[in-house]
């Protein structure tokens, strides 16, 4: 309001000053006239003093006039003084107003300075906030990367664990299949044995008169073999059960580990989701627009969850397979139990057959065997075809083994076997190495994909950070411009203050001059000086008024500039908000004239893609040819197998028809056939090797084709994206072209505001171009990588099987990194381009249509090639399975053929050996009967030994009671008398028992031995008795072990040497006598030692004992109990 008052006062002051200037001009004119009159008077004075009275009166009148004029001038001076005082008041008023205005201006300046300081603080706070937000975003990115790495590691660990589990399960499957094969083989053996038993039963029923002891011995041998096999089968069954239990335990542990890991991963994913949801909520509150990094992280988390779901599905499938395997194992166990039951029934029937001699029992056994065979045949219909071949081979092998001919192998056959084994080992090693290489290759491909995705993500982050840095640099430049403007306004204010100081100084000088004018009123000469001074003062006042006006105009300009600065600041704030919005949604720029070139480049690259697809189809045709070659090889293998089977069947039929000729030396025809078969086997082995190499080459090429297919997919996706961009740009291009056509003539700038708006629009277009340039690296890198991939395809076309494709692939992969530099140059050139021309826009739609048609054609070709590739892969898998089966059959056939050819070359034993074999079988039968009787006697003697041990324990308890009841040393004599009486009683008893036969009941002998041992117990001291008991127990255990070993050795000798003379049977009695003599000597020594150590003696008779006492608490072995009892009876008789 004060400024407005000042502005209102200025025109009134200007009008007053103009009126004063007019008055001053009139006064000056009057003074000039008065000066002329005074000059004329002075000239008259100088002319002469001789003047008349009239002249004096005239002079007086003139003087009066002059006095009157002086009074007038004085009045005028008074008026001027009043005017000057008024002017001084006005000046003081103006000075006060200017001081007030200066105070107002200073306050405004201070306010502006405070606002600027506040803005600086706000800008610094915003910068700090942005930096903190950037740091937080970087930390969040690092955390997200760490979490992604952890998830990847967990997924890799789970994949490795699943792979290891799958490998272990596959091993278990193989082992179970082997066990099943073994069970089938054993079942075949059982069938063969049952068939042989049936044949023997039929022979025996048909020829009952021919039954002899040799047949029974043979049946017993077979029983022995069956028992051994039964034991072996039981052991195998236990081992299988233990392995199954261990497998179930491992499966339970795996299931627990998987459930635990699944829960841990679920908890981690749940925590990640919660954290991500909270972060997303906070970010939405702070910044309502979505963050691309967070979206990428969410997509990665969703992908990880999908992978976890896939892994869980795989686990479920594995569990189903395990359940099927367990069911298969249970069925195999049930079959094994059923076979064991049938075997036991057959054994029982055989035993019954051995003990039976009537025809009715034979017929019953035959009927039972027939029923069992029918049941067994009904249960084994599923495996009938394979088992027939195995049964024939097993019967022939058993017939050949019965001939007991030593195998004779030639050197050529041994060398061939060694070669076969080496080739099989090499084949297995190559297969294992190939599998390892494939696993390593897949692992490296996965790593490469992960690194590429991370590189793309990091590049996008770098581009975003660059855009943010560029915008921050623009904001900093604007802030520096604001600072410059503020400094300039500050300098202007200082200059105005300086001008105000100068005006005050001039005003003070004017006051001093006015005071001097007031003092100067005495003389006329001083009047002229006063008028001069007044003129100077007036001129000075006018100058001051001009300077004041100029200063006021400058202040108005400064106010206008300050208003413009505030408007610019608001506009900058609005532009900053628009830039922040553009950060989140990058819009595409106006089209340039390089779009047509880009579309043409796309067309050329799509043509290259079509060429690559045709190359891929040619490679698929070559792969088809290779599969056809493999099918031919497999057909040849099948023909060879058929030939082998026919040869085996014909040869076996010849052997069965005339066995004498088969047992003789090899014929020339057999040798020729064998050589032909071996040549065919070698040729098949060579074919197997070549097919294996071709398969390796095919697998390598398959991996390369898969890589190229992935690249093609990426390129097609990028092409589709670019076409979508071009389609979205096409309406914008048309609009821009129409707008340019309308405004082509009105481009000349009219005002500065138009220039500013035009410059701001140019800046916005540049920002759009920057954002568009930031969105172009992916397309540029795609173009570069595509060029490099075409070079790789040309190299691959030149060398189909060489490794140059891998080198070119590496180059193409390395050239992707150089895509950025090309993109930068392209971006720098694209910013300087001109708008699109109408000719380019006319051809644009045609190029877009061509590109779309090419894309559709490439897509169709790709789908067709993918379907063909799937079909080829299925055929390859089938052929590989057939090839494995055929290799296994070929190995089995080779082994069987070699065994047959070796068995055909063995000579037959003479017919004289048959009689010897029968004699040996009869002798063996007799020995087995004797052994059975001895075993029965041994059991009976063991029962007697147990009774004796019970009686000895009773005696020991009675002795302890007697020891406790002994009162003193005087009772020792009584003990001696009692001993003597007991000795006499014992001798009497022994004399009586000598009169009886030694071969009668053994209980009396054991009672005598008991009495003797009781008697000797009273003679020995307790400590010595304990020591002797321990020694005797150890000796008895050692001797028992030795006897058992000798008995086993004797049985083995009898079984191995059946042709020994039966007269050598009484030899064991001599051995027993020798053992008995050694035993007696040991007993003598122990008895003498006991008599020397004891204060008591056996008896006080004069005759010395011819035989010493036996060891105390001696428990003789089963075979020597009776002999020791008889010996003690003889010693008692001699001593009496």
Swiss-Prot record:
Its main location: membrane. Residues 743-752 have a biased composition (Polar residues). Keywords: Coiled coil, Cytoplasmic vesicle, Differentiation, Fertilization, Membrane, Phosphoprotein, Spermatogenesis, Transmembrane, Transmembrane helix. Residues 1040-1052 have a biased composition (Basic and acidic residues). Residues 14-31, 1067-1091 have a biased composition (Acidic residues). GO terms for biological process: acrosome assembly; single fertilization; spermatogenesis. May play a role in acrosome formation in spermatogenesis and in fertilization. This is Coiled-coil domain-containing protein 136. The gene is Ccdc136.
